[in-house]
């Protein structure tokens, strides 16, 4: 039973009911009652501080907004809402969207063209999502679009650009980079051996260090057992940075209740 830190007036009871429904997704099931309370409080702050802007006639219902806010708040559960101060707006498409992009090839030529994107995190601007893949982020599968984009914002806070190294003590940077690059090398070797489709983790992680940090942050929160098994040293680095231990949380939850995945309404 979740106990909520609100008084018993009618508007607050209504709010309580909304948060209970929004929290009922598999990703958040392992959190303790205390963590649910803290997460809901952070999500409430998030909704007061950020603008959620639906695009292409998407209707963002109350529970959709609350679930978006909860997923944004999960990676900063111990860091605090101030860690998300690098943006003010979240744009939400119904599904993957097309953008004009520039890229440089191996010989230095710059190309432009249209590309399909799932999400974007602009260095000095909003986060862009698509609701279809936000819904795919509700389970414990290793995929989480919002956590991926939040990781980019946390990365950018460190130096003003995404490098794969978030805001950590200087003494920890060398070890962080060593373990991150080691994970990239191991994943690249696996991809070379079995191909991208058969790889055990998302091959996008080998794109560059920033994407590796973002992709593996998804696993840290939604498939911690896999990340810890494959890259235990990097798991501990993430644990120290995020100040959370999702694997211990998951094991405790599995050991203390009869597992039944929450229904998504």
Curated annotation (Swiss-Prot):
Q: GO annotations under biological process?
A: proteolysis
Protein name listed in UniProt: Mlc titration factor A
Q: What class of enzyme is it?
A: hydrolase
Gene3D superfamilies linked to this entry = Collagenase (Catalytic Domain), Glucose-regulated metallo-peptidase M90, N-terminal domain
Q: Which cofactor does it need?
A: Zn(2+)
Amino-acid positions noted as binding Zn(2+) in the UniProt annotation, renumbered to this chain: 111, 148, 152, 211
Keyword annotations of the record: Aminopeptidase, Cytoplasm, Hydrolase, Metal-binding, Metalloprotease, Protease, Zinc
Q: How does it assemble?
A: Interacts with Mlc.
Q: What does this protein do?
A: Involved in the modulation of the activity of the glucose-phosphotransferase system (glucose-PTS). Interacts with the transcriptional repressor Mlc, preventing its interaction with DNA and leading to the modulation of expression of genes regulated by Mlc, including ptsG, which encodes the PTS system glucose-specific EIICB component. Shows zinc-dependent metallopeptidase activity.
- A GO molecular-function term, please? metallopeptidase activity
What does the similarity note say?
Belongs to the MtfA family.
An example of a Gene Ontology cellular component annotation for this protein is:
cytosol
List its EC numbers.
3.4.11.-
Cysteine-cysteine disulfides = none
Question: Is this entry keyworded Metal-binding?
Answer: yes
* Keyword flag Ribosomal protein: no
Q: Where in the cell is it found?
A: Cytoplasm
Kindly state what the record says about how the cofactor is bound: Binds 1 zinc ion per subunit.
């Amino acid at each position: 039973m979740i106990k909520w830190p609100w008084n018993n007036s009618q508007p607050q009871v209504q709010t309580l009911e909304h948060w209970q429904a929004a929290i009922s997704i598999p990703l958040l099931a392992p959190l303790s009652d205390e963590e649910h309370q803290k997460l809901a409080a952070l999500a409430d702050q998030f909704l007061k501080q950020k603008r959620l802007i639906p695009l292409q006639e998407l209707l963002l219902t109350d529970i959709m907004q609350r679930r978006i806010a909860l997923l944004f708040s999960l990676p900063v559960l111990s860091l605090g809402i101030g860690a998300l101060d690098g943006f003010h707006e979240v744009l939400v498409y119904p599904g993957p969207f097309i953008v004009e992009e520039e890229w440089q090839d191996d010989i230095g030529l710059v190309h432009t063209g249209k590309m399909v994107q799932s999400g974007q995190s602009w260095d000095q601007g909003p986060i862009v999502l698509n609701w279809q893949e936000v819904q795919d982020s509700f389970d414990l599968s290793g995929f989480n679009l919002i956590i991926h984009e939040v990781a980019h914002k946390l990365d950018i806070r460190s130096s003003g650009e995404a490098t794969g190294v978030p805001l950590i003590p200087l003494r920890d940077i060398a070890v962080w980079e060593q373990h991150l690059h080691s994970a990239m090398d191991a994943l690249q070797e696996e991809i070379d051996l079995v191909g991208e489709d058969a790889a055990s983790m998302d091959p996008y992680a080998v794109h560059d260090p920033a994407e590796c940090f973002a992709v593996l942050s998804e696993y840290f929160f939604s498939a911690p057992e896999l990340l810890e098994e494959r890259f235990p040293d990097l798991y501990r680095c993430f644990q120290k940075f995020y100040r959370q231990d999702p694997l211990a949380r998951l094991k405790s939850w599995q050991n203390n209740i009869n597992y039944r995945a929450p229904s998504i309404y």
